[in-house]
A protein has these predicted regions:
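Structural preference for beta-rich elements and adjacent junctions enriched in aromatics
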Residues: 2-229
Length: 229
């Protein structure tokens, strides 16, 4: 996280949050690479979480990366720099969004309104749901089995990251899609978020801006676009 690319992204982030409108109105696109093995993440495009909303002066730099790992599923890497991240919850389906939390929302089937939300704190504690809107959500786990989350320990409590794997078998169960669905040019939608509803400093940042008057990440109309390469 401390490389020159991270520093450059962080400088751009400071400029963007100063105005908050720098993200623009057009949904952003992220081009998803298909790889044979766990990649060198320095070679994978970064989605900066540089749009902020709903007030407050505290800002956290975050970024996300997404790849299709052949014969396995999708891997999502989430990183942030944050002073003293809060991680109180330790059991599945706890309200981890109240901790220092990073989130991945995604509608993998371009022909369905259903989307998956995976929310994780700095300990890797996970909340995973599926549905068509905020009020239509059900537990997305299978008998308590959730997508594996690897926590990359934060150094001196100033940065932390997560590596989430969503297997194809899970996507087939939830969306009816398979590995063969994700051919080059296939498009689907989603967003990346960083929040801390009840942390020491409440904050909300995201990849694609959510333009609602009050905090609400369950807004698929504001999702960005993922394009398979």
């Amino acid at each position: 996280m401390k490389g020159s690319a991270m520093s450059q992204q962080k400088e751009e982030f400071v400029l963007n949050v100063a105005a908050c409108d720098a993200c623009g109105e057009t949904p952003r696109k992220y081009f998803v690479h298909s790889v044979k093995a766990v990649p060198d993440w320095n070679t994978i495009p970064v989605a900066p979480l540089d749009c902020c909303a709903w007030g407050g002066s505290y800002r956290v730099y975050g970024q996300a990366q997404l790849v299709l790992l052949r014969d396995v599923g999708f891997m999502c890497r989430l990183q942030c720099e944050e002073q003293a991240p809060v991680a109180r919850y330790q059991t599945y389906f706890s309200p981890v969004y109240q901790d220092s939390c990073m989130e991945f929302f995604c509608a993998f089937d371009q022909n369905s309104e259903k989307y998956l939300n995976v929310e994780m704190n700095a300990k890797g504690t996970c909340l995973c749901e599926i549905g068509t809107n905020r009020h239509d959500r059900v537990d997305a786990s299978e008998n308590g089995t959730v997508p594996p989350v690897k926590v990359e320990p934060f150094a001196q409590r100033t940065s932390w990251s997560l590596l989430l794997t969503i297997p194809f078998v899970t996507l087939t169960r939830l969306f009816g899609v398979t590995q063969e669905t994700f051919v080059p040019g296939y498009q689907f939608r989603g967003n990346f978020y960083k929040c801390g509803d009840a942390s020491t400093a409440t904050h909300y940042t995201m990849w694609n801006p959510v333009r609602t008057p009050t905090p609400d990440f369950h807004q698929p109309s504001f999702f960005g676009t993922f394009v398979m390469q």
